[in-house]
């Protein structure tokens, strides 16, 4: 047995004493320090939403309290679900609720797909001047005030308007379009399409520019025609934009177009034109029934929230794209 085998093993090194822990900065703090100038631009919009959108939500408490003008801001005494039971038993509410669903559905069916179709058609146009002209003509109505658009519609469809002049010219009789309930939905949806389709087209044209041209080249090599390229390359390429805009449109489904409807409708067209927002306006500002109007408005907001959450969940599970 040698001396090396009898030598004891060397002592283990002493564990290093841990130094003072260095606090790791949070990623959002680091980003805030680096890009504070950009984040500062969001201060005013956030204040706007806080002051004019979120703080007024506190006033929804009057849906559960008896409110009288000149009294307490939060109502005089608690009434619970009394106003909710009242409007659920009111046949007028269900009429305006049905009108809201019908107008919202028609608006979504026409105003959502038409910008996609127009963007796909313009994407195939190779003449730049023609393309720019069509783009300008289509999206300029978006910048017109709703008051101006409503005035144009009333001028065109009046008894002495251009449309009735054409009707008389072909041997027909003048039609009181704005006084007949059966015409209101077509008038509203067509004016909404004319005013909004161009702006949506610009968004989809911007999304089309992000599609890799190599995908089209590979599709052509595989023998795909223009229709198959559109179906298998173009539409999947703009799917995130389509889903985002669809969810945003569903978010405004219950609101429909309060200003335009308020300007175009009249008591003769109430059976098809009166929606929840205009009904609330009459209840709150003409009848001074603020608690009843607040209850209906809260119900409308809850339905809209459910629609947005449902659309986002379905989109995430079916196509894998969602807002959050």
Language-model regions, residue ranges each:
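Cytosolic juxtamembrane amphipathic/interface segments immediately preceding
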Residues: 23-30
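A structural signal for multi-pass alpha-helical bundles of membrane permease subunits
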Residues: 31, 37-324
